[in-house]
Design a protein with these regions (language model features):
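Cytosolic, long alpha-helical scaffolding segments
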Residues: 2-233
Length: 233
């Protein structure tokens, strides 16, 4: 009886390469500073958008104003893309530098600010606002200061040894928001006291309201940053 040649089968463990500890770790942990880099890019873009919007109050040239409004929209679109990238990385990475919910909330709140800046610029164009009130200019300046504080605070979050600096920025953001509330309330009171024409009153109130809401959204970012500090202190 002839013997059959023995067959050699590769075991499943031989056919599939093993995932080493280092490979597993790189899968679980995002690239060094990935989320911090994305947030730094996001807030830098937001600051550029806020500064661009603020240029509206420095010119009376309609073509320049329209160019500024277009640029504000472009920067808002860029912010949307960065937010989407943050959400994609959040889905793809198992371990994150702080709570996933906080990362999602921080990205959403930053995006909200950009949306309201762009929304204010669009209303100025759509409503054919020809003259800007002093309060609009002052609110825009407050917004730029808030976003500048956000940009610095978010970059400081990379190292928790900067926690005190972040807390100081949070206090300043909230204080600026309170100032914006006062400016808005006084402006609306003046509109009614001056008995402005109904159409003009509606246009001014819409623009002022959107601009003031943008400052409120800055406070939302400050609240998220404070939550992150509390959880990681």
């Amino acid at each position: 009886m002839s013997s059959r040649p023995s067959r050699h089968f590769k075991s499943e463990t031989q056919s599939k390469p093993k995932m080493g500890i280092s490979n597993l770790f790189s899968f679980l942990v995002p690239k060094n500073g990935l989320f911090f880099d994305l947030f730094a890019e996001d807030t830098a873009n937001l600051l550029e958008q806020a500064n661009e919007f603020n240029k509206l109050f420095g010119t009376q040239d309609k073509s320049e104003q329209l160019a500024i409004i277009r640029r504000v929209k472009e920067l808002e679109n860029k912010g949307d893309e960065i937010t989407h990238r943050i959400f994609l990385e959040l889905s793809a990475n198992f371990i994150t530098p702080f709570d996933r919910e906080d990362i999602h909330e921080l990205a959403t709140c930053i995006d909200d600010i950009a949306d309201y800046i762009q929304g204010t610029a669009s209303r100025i164009e759509l409503y054919h606002v020809d003259e800007f009130s002093k309060t609009m200019e002052l609110l825009s300046e407050v917004l730029v200061k808030q976003v500048s504080e956000i940009d610095t605070a978010v970059k400081d979050m990379r190292n928790m040894r900067n926690a005190d600096r972040v807390r100081e920025a949070i206090v300043r953001i909230n204080s600026l928001e309170n100032h914006a509330d006062d400016l808005f309330d006084e402006a609306i009171a003046r509109l009614f006291a001056d008995e402005a024409p109904a159409l003009e009153l509606i246009k001014m109130k819409e623009v002022l309201s959107n601009l003031e809401t943008a400052t409120d959204k800055c406070e939302d970012v400050a609240n998220v940053l404070e939550s992150i500090l509390v959880k990681n202190s």
